Amino acid sequence: MALKKFNPVTPSTRQLVIVDRSGLYKGKPVKGLTEGLTKSGGRNNYGRITARFIGGGHKRSYRIIDFKRRKFDVVGTVERIEYDPNRTAFIALIKYDDGELSYIIAPQRLAAGDKIVAGEAVDVKPGNAMPLASMPVGTIVHNIELKPGKGGQVARSAGGYAQLVGRDQGMAILRLNSGEQRVVHGSCMATVGAVSNPDHGNINDGKAGRTVWRGKRPHNRGVTMNPVDHPHGGGEGRTSGGRHPVSPWGKPTKGKKTRSNKATDKFILRSRHQRKS
């Protein structure tokens, strides 16, 4: 879908760039595939803020998405493509031949009326799902499982994808968007194609209010605070903070490596931090 720009009839529409969603379904989601969604406002069960700058925003209902795609060899028809406020990608309503309804993440080039199917060995076309062991090398995939049966966890946001670049001893080698190369078990499911809404990264909200509608509150810099609130606070007039950037709790930030070693590190063949050759 294309981007929409506006005539500058107000200051906020001057910079405003949004995704044209005229081709999406305009009604409400399927009630049986939705759940209530309670806002946390960034608070935990003690009522204390654990994630700053979160709160407000438009009320949402959660759409239950099928990330597992384990309904094998039952053909489904795409009823419509819908907007989902809980994610950057669009979602597709699928009606299977046995009458069951389901939501999946909509890949690019999937339209109402298309047929999709999941199985051990199915056609390589957008929306079809199969184990990585069954796919030809070079296939573009999304919604990739890291553990068989757990459901897709990788490449689920707008425009995301990975490429199957090889196989080795029952494992599939994937190249992710970040440049990381990773091995995943060949029995893990993945869906063919790249995720819909690739223009999401070109959106410009145009005004602070549109960000607030999404549930994000104003993000204050440490240098504008008082010393009691942040290590960068205080000083006469505007200051640069006077030290290397730290979090409100004094931990180094902006580039400091914080990732701890994990048992799954052995599945990373090439780090996303290695220089691109």
Swiss-Prot record:
In the UniProt record, does the keyword Nucleotide-binding occur?
Answer: no
InterPro entries from the UniProt entry? NA-bd_OB-fold (IPR012340), Rib_uL2_dom2 (IPR014722), Ribosomal_uL2 (IPR002171), Ribosomal_uL2_bac/org-type (IPR005880), Ribosomal_uL2_C (IPR022669), Ribosomal_uL2_CS (IPR022671), Ribosomal_uL2_dom3 (IPR014726), Ribosomal_uL2_RNA-bd_dom (IPR022666)
Q: Which GO terms describe its biological process?
A: cytoplasmic translation
Spell out the PROSITE patterns in the cross-references: RIBOSOMAL_L2
> Gene3D superfamilies of this UniProt entry?
2.30.30.30, Nucleic acid-binding proteins, Ribosomal protein L2, domain 3
Name one matching Pfam family.
Ribosomal_L2
Question: Where is the stretch described as Disordered?
Answer: 199-277
Q: Which GO terms describe its molecular function?
A: rRNA binding; structural constituent of ribosome; transferase activity
Q: Which keywords does this Swiss-Prot/TrEMBL entry list? A: Ribonucleoprotein, Ribosomal protein, RNA-binding, rRNA-binding
Tell me the SMART domains matching this sequence. Ribosomal_L2, Ribosomal_L2_C
GO CC list: large ribosomal subunit
- Does the record carry rRNA-binding as a key word? yes
Q: How does it assemble?
A: Part of the 50S ribosomal subunit. Forms a bridge to the 30S subunit in the 70S ribosome.
Q: What does this protein do?
A: One of the primary rRNA binding proteins. Required for association of the 30S and 50S subunits to form the 70S ribosome, for tRNA binding and peptide bond formation. It has been suggested to have peptidyltransferase activity; this is somewhat controversial. Makes several contacts with the 16S rRNA in the 70S ribosome.
Indicate the family of this protein: Belongs to the universal ribosomal protein uL2 family.
PANTHER family attached here?
Answer: LARGE RIBOSOMAL SUBUNIT PROTEIN UL2M, RIBOSOMAL PROTEIN L2
| NCBIfam families hit by this protein | rplB_bact (TIGR01171)
Q: What is this protein called?
A: Large ribosomal subunit protein uL2
Q: Which organism is it from?
A: Mesorhizobium japonicum (strain LMG 29417 / CECT 9101 / MAFF 303099) (Mesorhizobium loti (strain MAFF 303099))
Q: Which gene encodes it?
A: rplB
